[in-house]
């Protein structure tokens, strides 16, 4: 009798164990089905400022929960050098916010895909569409940005001209992006080359360098130095200055000298050979369409659209632009060969 009970007990235990193991196997299989489906990666290389990248990253997560969209930041110079060196054998799928001269060089080398079917090129101003293989992200305007509070602390007046920046009282108070690594830095150089001639412009920057606190690697550097009170005067980007003012940095002031606001266009595209991936096409279409419009509306309202205009609080109106004619990569490379800093 006891033997029969033990046999029955053992049978029940075996059945219970079998049921438990079956349930565990089923759960494991189900878990592997869900976890095994890896998200498709889309890699974006960008020279955009951190706050603009953060907006894009957030919007991509909302729009594409099934994709892993990675944004890697580099300065303009670093990004251009990396893409030129790697060609089509790059880990990058999409370029976002690279200076037009470099976009054109990549395009001429066959490195960019035809993106005309993925965005409405007809929406953009005529001067921004120079190839079917890339479209604008924004028009970057430059200005003289001041920390008026720090100038008052130092007991020095606001500068009124480029010539004023050479005065000894501004020694160590000026920050400028290095044109070798920053498109923003170069556009200031190009504007003065066009205004004064190359020899006079180079002579000017030789003198200005005596007052420069630092040549920063990125266009964001001068305004960051102003906020940290490391510098009082920055040759920087109007959109970034406005963004910081709107965030509460009320000691910043935007100023234009007689020569006007230097500017350059920045673009976006897909690396040639990556345009056949559906994920890349979807991400680029969203980036070049909705997100470029949002970028213009929120941060960078200088005109890139034919019919759309946007007002950002505290953004200067009726900007006088500098002469930026002849802004080619060949001219830039020739100038930078003579740049000492």
PLM ranges: what are they?
Residues 1-42:
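Short, low-complexity disordered leader/linker segments with a strong preference
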Residues 36-105:
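Early extracytoplasmic/lumenal segment of secretory-pathway proteins
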Residues 101-105, 227, 232-251:
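A ligand-binding cleft/hinge motif common to bilobed small-molecule-binding domains
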Residues 113-119, 134-135, 163, 250-262, ...:
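Short beta-strand->loop
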Residues 124, 140, 170-177, 204-209, 215-216, 286-309, ...:
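Periplasmic-binding protein-like
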């Amino acid at each position: 009798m006891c033997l029969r009970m033990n046999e029955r007990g053992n049978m029940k235990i075996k059945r219970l164990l079998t049921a438990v193991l079956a349930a565990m196997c089923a759960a494991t299989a189900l878990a592997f089905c869900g976890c095994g489906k890896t998200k498709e990666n889309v890699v974006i290389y960008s020279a955009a400022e951190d706050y603009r990248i953060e907006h894009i990253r957030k919007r991509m997560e909302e729009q594409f929960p099934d994709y892993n969209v990675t944004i890697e930041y580099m300065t303009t110079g670093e990004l251009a050098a990396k893409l030129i060196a790697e060609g089509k054998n790059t880990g990058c799928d999409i370029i976002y916010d690279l200076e037009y001269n470099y976009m054109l060089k990549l395009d001429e080398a066959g490195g960019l895909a035809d993106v005309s079917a993925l965005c409405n090129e007809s929406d953009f101003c005529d001067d921004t569409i120079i190839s079917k293989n890339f479209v604008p992200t924004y028009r970057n305007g430059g200005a003289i940005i001041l920390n008026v509070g720090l100038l008052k602390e130092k007991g020095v007046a606001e500068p009124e001209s480029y010539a004023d920046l050479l005065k000894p009282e501004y020694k160590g108070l000026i920050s400028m992006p290095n044109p070798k690594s920053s498109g923003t830095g170069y556009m200031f150089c190009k504007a003065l080359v066009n205004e004064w001639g190359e020899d006079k412009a180079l002579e000017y920057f030789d003198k200005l360098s005596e007052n420069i606190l630092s040549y920063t690697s990125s266009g964001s550097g001068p305004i960051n130095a102003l906020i940290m009170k490391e510098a009082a005067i920055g040759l920087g980007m109007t959109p970034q200055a406005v963004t910081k003012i709107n965030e509460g940095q009320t000691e910043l002031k935007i100023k234009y000298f007689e020569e006007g606001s230097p500017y350059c266009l920045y673009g976006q595209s897909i690396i040639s050979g990556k345009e056949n991936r559906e994920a890349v096409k979807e991400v680029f279409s969203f980036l070049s369409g909705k997100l470029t419009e949002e970028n213009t509306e929120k941060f960078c309202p200088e005109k890139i659209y034919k019919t759309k205009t946007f007002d950002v609080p505290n953004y200067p109106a009726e900007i006088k632009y500098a002469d930026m004619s002849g802004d080619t990569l060949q001219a830039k490379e020739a100038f930078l060969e003579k740049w000492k800093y």
